[in-house]
Amino acid sequence: MKTTTSDPSTLDILTFWDVLQNLLIPIWPQDRTVVNGQALGDAWPLSTLKTQSKDDNSDESTYIQPFHKLTQWLAYSLTVPFTRILSLEWKNMSSMTALPEYRNGGLFVDLGVLSLKPASQDRGLKATSDGSGLPSFAAGDDVIVEWRAMTLVLVDKLYKLVLQRMQGVELSMAQLLEAGTWKAGREVAKEKRPKTKSSPIVILSDGTVF
């Protein structure tokens, strides 16, 4: 990892991100979204991007919503030893996003901020086979991709609201996620579904997304 030329005690998260992506993209399953022969990992087509677009673009890659949740989680985690042990600082951390996963997203569903459309709810319930009574969808289903995208937007808005109440006390996005939305999502899920503590929407995944 190279430090910035202007300050040898500062690392650039954008450079670190490039390193992680170059290392990890090749290991993701090849049945995922592919552009120019390259599997993209945790990035999925989203029909909303196409229907809301004002451009008549035939390039389907334009309508892909990237998440890379596991890689971002890893990146957040790996910044900690550089800071705490080596006393180095990171720049461009604001380029990182929230983590679009089922605890953060489940919080907004359980609290009534987001809800499935009736047709999607019915389709999800028909796909459920575990007796949970919860709607289930594949990780690449448009419902899940849109839910995760909305999770990013809502956590960003929540982060700004929380910062306004911090009275100048520094709070990173990673701290909000770990001690705030993720923990709250788990606690609310435990209260609403004590037997399973599962998300209100079940994601059918092979473990390479969540």
What is each residue range found by the language model?
Residues 124-128:
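C-terminal structural cap/anchor segments
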